[in-house]
Amino acid sequence: MSPEALSELIFNIANTLVSEGKAGTLTADLIPPQAKFAVMRPKDRAHGDWASNAAMQLAKKAGMKPRDLAELFAAELTNADGIKSVEVAGPGFINITLDSASAAAVVDTVLEAGSDYGKNDHLSGKTLNLEFVSANPTGPIHIGGTRWAAVGDSMARVLEANGAKVVREYYFNDHGEQINRFAKSLVAAAHGEETPIDGYKGAYIDEIAKRVIDEANADGVDVLSLPRVDGGADQDGNPLGEGDSEQREEFRKRAVPMMFDEIQRSMKNFRVNFDVWFHENSLYSDGEVDQAIADLRARGDIFEKDGATWFESTKHGDDKDRVIIKSDGNYAYFAADIAYYRNKRHRETNPADVAIYMLGADHHGYIGRMMAMCEAFGDKPGENMQILIGQLVNVMKDGKAVRMSKRAGNVVTIDDLTDAIGVDASRYSLARTDYNSPVDIDLNLLSSHSNENPVYYVQYAHARSCNVDRNAAAAGITYEGADVSLLDTTADGEVLAALAQWPALLREAGDLRAPHRVAHYLEDLAATYHKWYNVERVVPMELTDPEARGEQADAIRIAKAPEPARAAARLKLNDAVKTVIAEGLDLLGVTAPDKM
């Protein structure tokens, strides 16, 4: 019997007690939803397999003492199939012990569902637009963007496991001043000049500049001989200033697609596949910025002051109104944000019911204006728009901060990280910490084969379970027809309980937008499995060296051979663990090796 089944049973008992007039002043409309009747694993196993505080939740509404109400629940629970015993403890806790068959039923449930175990459809019918990374195309993706890549894609997978339709989206900032500075930096590098004060540095700038020159030469264009004088306008219609004219535009139009290709390559190598690559410049070229402003104007949220056009965001909870068209006629950056949200909600293909923005810590000040804009369009902040703010990443090696990249200068890039520790360790280590908290990435630890390395510890549990399968096959042991009720030891019970908690954990991770909970669960399951493996054998091993210690002993230790029926049941439990670990790792975009 799973925790969810127990919650449902307790919910039904509450309604039964009301209908029979045994629950004092409690009425059916005062009973909370089933999900509110949480069933917990007691810290002290002497208190049973599961515990509920339902009586304490309802006692005040019933006008009864919690223990008295708990006794009524206990009497009903005792008669339920699969429950061995029930005890009321303390102020009104209900401690429940399952019979062995009921506790072990989760094994069959896992193996029948396979990689779908725990997945549900409670978010079905909703399209969630999840925008993440969205780094400027002015250089390689840095470590902060790398964290969002790991967290964002893992979050998307978790949401999909809960039935949501997820659109993974990357907003490509190919319009505005940062692109101008990027192009200026390339021109300076091409001429061997110093980087502009507000420009971009790093070996990649020299690389891109050379690629632009080579590509232009192949097209018959001598880019270095193009004018570098005043005159004309850039692709955004802005006047070209000194050092900004035709030559800079040639570098710009060739270099931005190069960076776009590099970013796409990095994301693919990191196992992140976006559904939409949205170009900011299209909002201007397609007239969507003007349409969005006109829409807000029609709603009474636009006014003119000091020669500029303003969004009256204070009407919707912002701390001040926002300029969207400056007095010089140029658009403020926020104008594109307005148009982009409107596009997400009303596009023809997969319009978003919920637009989720994953932003860096430096964007915290954007929340007020974004939520105000959402409300101005008639939507519900927090429901139709959700903003997640991530914190900083510190990369450490030999106890010291790593701040330099061979290619990108003073930042650590996605390729730097994956070259150092691989994609698996990179994704896992970045996703396992709540994005609301800073995270330290210890390169020494994450490249080690030790139990202190969390990704190694979890992957090793999967590899170990695969090895058990191979040894069992060699010994002729199968679990066909196995009686899981024989899984009745303390170690068995711990593994069974861990497996039973996966569906609720997965649902919670989706509702809370918290993929790090998946990683924490996997680490707990791996620890429980490793302990089980050390005390419960499936296949006996011969002792070839009585003096063996440590890892060597783990491979050759002798164990009493279990009877065939119990060996089969343990093999079945082993495979259930293997299934759930593989599923959890996949949700984090991490491989589940069968050998290590």
UniProtKB/Swiss-Prot annotation:
PROSITE patterns according to UniProt: AA_TRNA_LIGASE_I
Origin organism lineage: Bacteria, Bacillati, Actinomycetota, Actinomycetes, Bifidobacteriales
Catalytic activity: tRNA(Arg) + L-arginine + ATP = L-arginyl-tRNA(Arg) + AMP + diphosphate
Localization per record: Cytoplasm
Cystine connections: none
UniProt entry keywords in alphabetical sequence: Aminoacyl-tRNA synthetase, ATP-binding, Cytoplasm, Ligase, Nucleotide-binding, Protein biosynthesis
UniProt source species: Bifidobacterium adolescentis (strain ATCC 15703 / DSM 20083 / NCTC 11814 / E194a)
Region (Disordered): 227-249
GO molecular function: arginine-tRNA ligase activity; ATP binding
BP GO terms, sorted: arginyl-tRNA aminoacylation
Enzyme Commission number(s): 6.1.1.19
Motif range ('HIGH' region): 135-145
A GO CC annotation given for this chain: cytoplasm
PANTHER family, per the entry: ARGININE--TRNA LIGASE, CYTOPLASMIC (PTHR11956:SF5), ARGINYL-TRNA SYNTHETASE (PTHR11956)
Subunit structure: Monomer.
Gene name for this UniProt entry: argS
Family affiliation: Belongs to the class-I aminoacyl-tRNA synthetase family.
Broadest EC class assigned to this enzyme: ligase
Protein's UniProt name: Arginine--tRNA ligase
Pfam family, one: DALR_1
Major localization listed first in the record, in broad terms: cytoplasm
